[in-house]
Amino acid sequence: MSGKYFEATDQNFQAEILNSDKVALVDFWAAWCGPCMMLGPVIEELAGDYEGKAIIAKLNVDENPNTAGQYGIRSIPTMLIIKGGKVVDQMVGALPKNMIAKKLDEHIG
């Protein structure tokens, strides 16, 4: 099931991701990154699957360099799982949906 992910920015990251009471999966990506484009549909599917249970977000590193820099993002795509305002897990690369979901499930509930 496809859903709408949250578009995270330098401006809304604190309020919408860090201050949320839900677990968040944030995909750090760029338009010029081939593996990022491959991961896009997976993120949309996860947004539908986890609607109401977790925040599924994407953050464009070119448009939002402050947040990407703050988290030391060097390779993209990088996905961070954030819970209670802290990074609790990290994944790098265009991973399959089931691997991402398994990691996310470990931090929900």
Swiss-Prot record:
Highest rank taxon of the organism: Bacteria
CDD domains in UniProt: TRX_family
Keyword Transport: yes
Keyword Electron transport set for record: yes
Cystine connections: 33-36
Family from the record: Belongs to the thioredoxin family.
Protein name stated in the entry: Thioredoxin 2
Naturally occurring in which organism (per UniProt): Chlorobaculum tepidum (strain ATCC 49652 / DSM 12025 / NBRC 103806 / TLS) (Chlorobium tepidum)
Lineage: Bacteria, Pseudomonadati, Chlorobiota, Chlorobiia, Chlorobiales
